[in-house]
A protein has these predicted regions:
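GIY-YIG-like beta-to-alpha core
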Residues: 58-66
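Active-site and NAD+-binding cores of ADP-ribose-processing enzymes
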Residues: 1-54, 64, 71-206
Length: 206
């Protein structure tokens, strides 16, 4: 993968000199795959495609050691600091982000939250806002496909993904801060349509 000289120099500054006053955030993605096909980067594991409740794309972290827990091979992504970045904290997820996703998902099924759900269902749906983002949406798909509501599970998963993907498409990156993991590591999603292959590179030799 050929990079512009200025971009290559920036990567070298980060890796070899640990400089932080540049125009990019350096993000890390680790995998056990010896060959990483960026054309199919939204297929995060071999075999059948699986549910991505936080949206399709490639996930990174600014915490290299945390990233390495997911695989032996580490890749870099340079995210320009001028990018349009959506930052989600546990507080903002609980107070607004989850409710927005829930509203749009229910609308897809023509469910009126106030008229078409029981008191118990209302309590369950809103309780999920207090979980971590990935847990909230995993439990939402289980609730919608439960016998009480009875929607088809694969369809529910596709619906949640499509809603989240549409929200994420407005941004170059979605940055989850303090929403999960005991190490307080962040997680950054580069959405499918925002991913720039020229900024994705295998780790350079030390």
């Amino acid at each position: 993968m050929k990079l512009e000289k200025s971009v290559t120099n920036t990567i070298k500054e980060y890796i070899n000199k640990e400089k932080t006053t540049t125009n990019y955030y350096i993000l890390y993605h680790s995998t056990d795959s010896d060959f990483f096909n960026v054309i199919q980067y939204d297929n995060a594991k071999k075999g059948d495609r699986y549910f991505n409740p936080l949206g399709n794309g490639l996930y990174f972290s600014t915490n290299k050691q945390f990233s390495k827990t997911f695989g032996k091979n580490t890749y870099y992504y340079l995210l320009p600091k001028t990018s349009k970045i959506k930052k989600i904290t546990y507080k903002s997820w609980t107070e607004s982000s989850y409710q927005n996703i829930l509203k749009l998902v229910l609308k897809k099924y023509n469910i009126d939250y106030w008229k078409d759900t029981t008191h118990t269902q209302k309590v369950e749906l809103m309780r999920l806002a207090n979980n971590t983002p990935i847990s909230s949406l995993n439990e939402l798909q289980e609730l919608l496909s439960s016998p009480d509501l009875g929607y088809n599970l694969p369809n529910v998963q596709e619906t949640i993904e499509s809603v989240v993907d549409k929200i994420n498409a407005k941004y170059d990156a979605v940055w989850y801060k303090d929403t999960d993991y005991y190490q307080k590591a962040d997680e950054i999603l580069i959405p499918t349509l925002s991913f720039k292959k020229e900024l994705f590179i295998k780790e350079l030799p030390k």
